[in-house]
Amino acid sequence: MKTVVFAYHDMGCLGIEALLAAGYEISAIFTHTDNPGEKAFYGSVARLAAERGIPVYAPDNVNHPLWVERIAQLSPEVIFSFYYRHLIHDKILQLAPAGAFNLHGSLLPKYRGRAPLNWVLVNGETETGVTLHRMVKRADAGAIVAQLRIAIAPDDIAITLHHKLCHAARQLLEQTLPAIKDGNILEIAQRENEATCFGRRTPEDSFLEWHKPASVLHNMVRAVADPWPGAFSYVGNQKFTVWSSRVHSHAPAAQPGSVISVAPLLIACGDGALEIVTGQAGDGITMQGSQLAQTLGLVQGSRLNSQPACAARRRTRVLILGVNGFIGNHLTERLLREDHYEVYGLDIGSDAISRFLNHPHFHFVEGDISIHSEWIEYHVKKCDVVLPLVAIATPIEYTRNPLRVFELDFEENLRIIRYCVKYRKRIIFPSTSEVYGMCSDKYFDEDHSNLIVGPVNKPRWIYSVSKQLLDRVIWAYGEKEGLQFTLFRPFNWMGPRLDNLNAARIGSSRAITQLILNLVEGSPIKLIDGGKQKRCFTDIRDGIEALYRIIENAGNRCDGEIINIGNPENEASIEELGEMLLASFEKHPLRHYFPPFAGFRVVESSSYYGKGYQDVEHRKPSIRNARRCLDWEPKIDMQETIDETLDFFLRTVDLTDKQS
């Protein structure tokens, strides 16, 4: 039976060996490159694959269409995943007629998600296990095929439990793989009401909070003992790691974090005391507790703390979903210019943010919000401010793919909004000037203008209505459940990195990018319905400064507000935009590399956007809320924005084949 395998870690190695022993034909193995910052105590899937003569790959994004196509060409009958660390897209799972199966290190539906081995120890569980289940779109939610229980002994630590899980996994696979091959398995649906889900753990999560019971801290020590990074605390500014510990239930009463004795090294906790049996000062060597006390200069009555005594104010953690997009990458640049922000980002690409990837306060994961729900929920919980910037926001897609617009722009964002409600996190949500629709007011006002859209048979309005409904949902959560929020409405922001010329080639871009492509390729500039529609164009730098001030939220003035961010002085028709762009193009130093101007061509909107499109004649913002809440005023003239945007795109064009 032909299979494609996704695998990593010891579980990946034993899963591959079990498949081969059961007579499966492995066409390819997908794994990960090792993280140099991670202590690799486990077997190498890549090395095993090479030794067995099996093709092995470690793509950054296995869900990329190119990899999906390559996997499809392998024609797998069944797919297996053994501790592969990325979610696998449904498009891949559907390639195998017999389905896809994942090995998970817990007794599902308990402990779905990441690091179940560590979490069961943190939580003081006495039982865990391994589960083989069918893979579905939602992580770890498919029907259970086989399950094996394991007792957790009081003296088990992470590595001993890991070895138990590996032994159990071998047994389970040896019993179950032949049945899958024969098509003779019994599947049991998971009980959703019993499900629990946990996110990934980082070394920073393992600090010892001395106000907690000693038993809780002891479980933390067990969960992250060597070869994991270890639980830690501080003496002043000196960090030390606790590798093994013991609970003392009847210790003398003392302030939590106080040293009760140094031989043994006994620390008072919220309930009981924790004996530090072995530990390590800084990057030194492991030593027994009394020697550690001497090394750290501890005496009876000394106080420990959970963070450095001189720790600076914690940086505000900002989660940006869609960080590689136009607003996301410019906002990241603005935030990192300051020293008090930590930016966490998710997107399906990284070309626009490559300049930040090595920044110590920028953390990026390449992924799709529709399949990385576990990662998103964990980071919503972890961060202070959430900006869900992912959306389809190009007009041609509103008529071309209305359901996809609804699914991404509404359904996926609603899930994120609910996470913010659940974890009581501040959300800064990108509404849109499109919500005003065909409003006839001279200035579109956030608090008074009516939101007017066309009939249902005009799918062009699905983006506007999706955003408007989310605005209303957020407002209701704010009113009824105390959600801290700000809605901002961008009015035609433009500048470098707005879309790209490849998107413009398929019509999926904003106006100025499409016009620049026409100039670059020597094709006529198309003026939809004559190009008389007027817009107020806003420089990205002005827009980002306003958005930055919303994040800063001086005096909490932005809470519960809707804020237009636009430049009412930069009003121009699309035809006028084209003329200004042409004038800038003709005097650009790279002009001679490109074809002659092919003129303007008037086209009907239905022939360009398709059936169901309606346009808006004017869209001018009132910016009184921005002035009041942000003390903000747009400053940059439209011509300057046009010149810089054009220059950016012209310098991205490969000129080698345009030499005269």
Curated annotation (Swiss-Prot):
Entry GO terms, CC: membrane
List of residues binding NAD(+): D347, D368, I369
InterPro entries: Arna-like_SDR_e (IPR045869), Bifun_polymyxin_resist_ArnA (IPR021168), Epimerase_deHydtase (IPR001509), Formyl_trans_C (IPR005793), Formyl_transf_N (IPR002376), Formyl_transf_N_sf (IPR036477), Formyl_transferase-like_C_sf (IPR011034), Lipid_A_modif_metabolic_enz (IPR050177)
Biological or metabolic pathway of the protein: Nucleotide-sugar biosynthesis; UDP-4-deoxy-4-formamido-beta-L-arabinose biosynthesis; UDP-4-deoxy-4-formamido-beta-L-arabinose from UDP-alpha-D-glucuronate: step 1/3; Nucleotide-sugar biosynthesis; UDP-4-deoxy-4-formamido-beta-L-arabinose biosynthesis; UDP-4-deoxy-4-formamido-beta-L-arabinose from UDP-alpha-D-glucuronate: step 3/3; Bacterial outer membrane biogenesis; lipopolysaccharide biosynthesis
Pfam family, one: Formyl_trans_N
Residue numbers marked as site, Raises pKa of active site His: D140
EC number: 2.1.2.13, 1.1.1.305
Active site: H104, E434, R619
Family as reported in the entry's similarity comment: In the N-terminal section; belongs to the Fmt family. UDP-L-Ara4N formyltransferase subfamily. In the C-terminal section; belongs to the NAD(P)-dependent epimerase/dehydratase family. UDP-glucuronic acid decarboxylase subfamily.
Function: Bifunctional enzyme that catalyzes the oxidative decarboxylation of UDP-glucuronic acid (UDP-GlcUA) to UDP-4-keto-arabinose (UDP-Ara4O) and the addition of a formyl group to UDP-4-amino-4-deoxy-L-arabinose (UDP-L-Ara4N) to form UDP-L-4-formamido-arabinose (UDP-L-Ara4FN). The modified arabinose is attached to lipid A and is required for resistance to polymyxin and cationic antimicrobial peptides.
HAMAP family according to UniProt: ArnA
Protein's name according to its UniProt entry: Bifunctional polymyxin resistance protein ArnA
Organism: Escherichia coli O7:K1 (strain IAI39 / ExPEC)
